[in-house]
UniProtKB/Swiss-Prot annotation:
Catalytic activity: a triacylglycerol + H2O = a diacylglycerol + a fatty acid + H(+)
PROSITE patterns: LIPASE_SER
Lineage: Eukaryota, Fungi, Dikarya, Ascomycota, Saccharomycotina
EC number: 3.1.1.3
Gene: ATG15
Key words of the record: Autophagy, Endosome, Glycoprotein, Hydrolase, Lipid degradation, Lipid metabolism, Membrane, Signal-anchor, Transmembrane, Transmembrane helix
Main enzyme class: hydrolase
Source organism of this protein record: Pichia angusta
GO molecular function: phospholipase activity; triacylglycerol lipase activity
UniProt function note: Lipase which is essential for lysis of subvacuolar cytoplasm to vacuole targeted bodies and intravacuolar autophagic bodies. Involved in the lysis of intravacuolar multivesicular body (MVB) vesicles. The intravacuolar membrane disintegration by ATG15 is critical to life span extension.
Parts of the chain that traverse the membrane: 9-31
Name of this chain's protein: Putative lipase ATG15
């Protein structure tokens, strides 16, 4: 017989080896099960999208135009393309931006949104909420859960294509293009003046017109290198400062505000802010008009929205308003504007049904909400971008830790995120719901909606009224009269009134407390204006 100690070693080794194999097998099984959804994403249906129309709303309450991308336009554009070669991001496209096909994969999703999403119904609610802010929270909407097509956010080509659509909105257009009037109050004598301002929406469709994507143009900012031809700088800055500042860009007493809602130190009129955001000459109203026209042209299509910077924030607001899938790139935090506009938000919406995505990188100070303060580049350029909270989900590429980047405003450009971020990473960023966030925590926003219901009877008059027939000559500093005089005009009025009453009654005074008389005519306040004999 051999040594029993030597006999036990092989058995122990066999048991350990078996345990290791079991653990590895289970780990591989778990890994395979987790990877399964990703494999499905790569086999999801795809469609090739091309631009079909460009809508331009001048944000003046009257001008709205549509440009159809047809053979005539392409001929005009190609002949003038050499003059637009200086425009940034043109080289991102392999062919003309108006001829390139962009492949996007979609998948089946779920959402909870309004049962009635017609522009007339939604805008009527927004108008009501504007006048009755607190009362609008008591409205119970008819929500419904339904299936819809959403972009495959785990597919790299899809995200790159959506980013290229956002970049396409910055491309310059020929000045002699044939625009169609789709507004009601367009002045034909102003042929091209409206082109220098407003919002542009580029409309892409697939061949079957199953999905329509609206790309909203972002900020053309002088000194911020955000892209564009610079024609809308001032109007873009006004809307940026209105949407993303705490109170009308009131950073200090040296700043020129974009509205008159500031009351005192860190105190702002909430109702005034909401009124300013809904003005007809603001960008939010302009994108509502663009959406109205697109739904009229494509009533049966699924509509998505996308955009970069300001265009990304506007696309998120539009998506929240009508329950649309929205993908933004390097957008400023728009959660504060969402609440100020009283946009409908379904209660208790699960994270997987949140179909608003914000794509950005950690080296972009605007996307991260840190481009503020007296010494920041944004402040020096006149932009009060004080918000950092986003609604929906955030898909953040950590280029600071992964690639060693430094925070720089140049990393906000759409060109940077396409060529240096999206094209460099092999995998897409994970999209997660951000932690709880609160903007402008040190400000006090005053609601004055109850002031309209106050009457003069319920509030004391600052100066006491004089008694009949007397007139105050001198008052103390707190309003008490200490010198009186007779008021001839009051005596004359009393005499005339008494004379009128004598025609209908034998009582010589203007106060009727007895006799066979009755009031035959009263004011809307209930005071009797004319007395007469009692009817029997």
């Amino acid at each position: 017989m051999g040594n029993p100690t030597l006999m036990r070693w092989p058995v122990t080794r066999i048991l350990v080896l078996g345990l290791v194999v079991t653990v590895l097998y289970k780990a591989m099984a778990i890994y395979s099960s987790r990877r399964a959804p990703v494999q499905v994403c790569f086999t999801s249906p795809s469609s090739a999208f091309k631009i079909k129309h460009i809508f331009h709303n001048a944000a003046d309450g009257r001008t709205h135009k549509r440009l159809d991308i047809d053979d005539e336009f392409l001929s005009i554009y190609n002949s003038a393309r050499s003059q637009m070669a200086h425009i940034e991001d043109m080289d991102l496209f392999t062919v003309s931006p108006f001829e390139q096909e962009l492949v996007i994969r979609h998948t089946e999703g779920q959402t909870v949104r309004l049962a009635d999403r017609s522009p007339d119904f939604v805008e009527s609610y927004l108008d009501y909420a504007l006048e009755n802010g607190p009362a609008s929270r008591m409205i119970e909407f008819d929500w419904q859960q339904e299936s819809l097509l959403i972009p495959n956010m785990s597919d790299k080509e899809t995200i790159v294509s959506l980013a290229l659509m956002s970049s396409d909105a910055y491309v310059g257009l020929p000045t002699d293009a044939d625009w169609n009037d789709v507004g009601d109050k367009y002045n034909e004598s102003e042929r091209f003046g409206w082109e220098n301002g407003g919002v542009r929406g580029h409309v892409f469709t697939d061949p079957e017109e199953t999905i329509v994507i609206i790309s909203i143009k972002g900020t053309s900012a002088a000194g911020l290198n955000t892209g564009g031809d610079g024609q809308t700088v001032e109007q873009d800055k006004t809307n940026d400062n209105l949407l993303f500042s705490c109170c009308c860009a009131r950073v200090s007493s040296l700043w020129k505000t974009v509205c008159d809602c500031y009351e005192e130190s860190y105190t702002c009129n909430q109702n005034c802010l909401e009124q300013e955001l809904r003005r007809p000459d603001r960008y939010y109203k302009a994108v509502l008009e663009i959406y109205r026209n697109v739904t009229h042209m494509y009533p049966e299509s699924e509509i998505w929205v996308t955009g970069h910077s300001l265009g990304g924030s506007l696309s998120s607001l539009l998506g929240r308003t009508f329950g649309l899938p929205a993908v933004s790139f390097e957008a400023v935090g728009e959660l504060l504007a969402t609440r100020r506009l009283h946009l409908p938000m379904p209660p208790g919406l699960p994270e997987e049904m949140e179909n608003i995505w914000h794509v950005g990188n950690t080296a972009d100070p605007i996307f991260m909400g840190v481009c503020n303060g007296a010494s920041s580049t944004c402040s020096l350029a006149g932009y009060a971008l004080e918000t950092q909270c986003h609604s929906g989900k955030k898909c953040v590429y950590d280029v600071v830790n992964d690639l060693g980047w430094h925070v720089n405003l140049l990393n906000h450009r759409i060109r940077t995120i396409i060529s240096d971020v999206l094209m460099v990473y092999n995998d897409t960023a994970e999209c997660v719901k951000p932690p709880p966030c609160y903007d402008c925590y040190n400000w006090r926003f005053v609601d004055h909606s109850g002031d309209r219901y106050r009457t003069t009877a319920s509030s004391p008059s600052p100066i006491p009224s004089d008694p009949p027939g007397r007139r105050c000559l001198k008052r103390t500093w707190y309003g008490r009269c200490y010198e009186w005089a007779d008021d001839p005009s009051a005596v004359k009025t009393t005499f005339a009134t008494s004379t009128i009453y004598r025609k209908t009654s034998d009582i010589s005074t203007s106060t009727h407390t007895g006799g066979n008389t009755t009031c035959i005519r009263r004011s809307w306040l209930g005071y009797c204006l004319e007395y007469g004999p009692e009817l029997r």
